[in-house]
Amino acid sequence: MFIKICGITNAQDALDAVECGADALGFVFAESPRKVSVETVREIVKQLPADVLTIGVFRDHVSQDVVNTVREACLVGAQLHGHESAQQVAEVMAEVNWVAKSVVAGSAEASGSNNYGTEMILVDSANPGTGTGYDLSLLAQLPKMINVILSGGLTVVNVAESIRAVSPWGVDVSSGVEFSPGIKDRLKIREFITNARAIG
């Protein structure tokens, strides 16, 4: 089970997440209480093991800006969390090793997500980063043969049940393992990962 801890804002939370077993860390460059600077992310990434997947989260940024930020922050991948077109996704994929496109559960974009050309589709609620969930039955509309990363409203309490319900390729959590926006709770991270791995 692929596990991404998103909304990392400081080195201690990043190191804690990695020590607890996270596969990937997300750094938000879109407007958000968890928004970070390129300089901050670069300093955090320097302290991480080389095998950790580091991902920049963007919303409706120009494709070249995404590519430039990924490079400047020394990241591996990009998560496109806005209204990016298939062409914009392709432009980023041509320059960045790992790219995921986010779609809102139940949306037309979700049902046509195979048109984006990326194997990674992150399914979220309409209000990302708020802890808001959605009806998991909406995932039935997704095209087959796509690696689905489940996000939106996941917590230590419901992650195992959610994985059982839809068998995603991975899970992504932000607010569900926080004290407050941008400040992670190490104990919740550990419990979340333990519960997720117990199923997947």
Model-derived segments and spans:
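Conserved N-terminal beta1-alpha1 strand-loop-helix module at the mouth
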Residues: 1-200
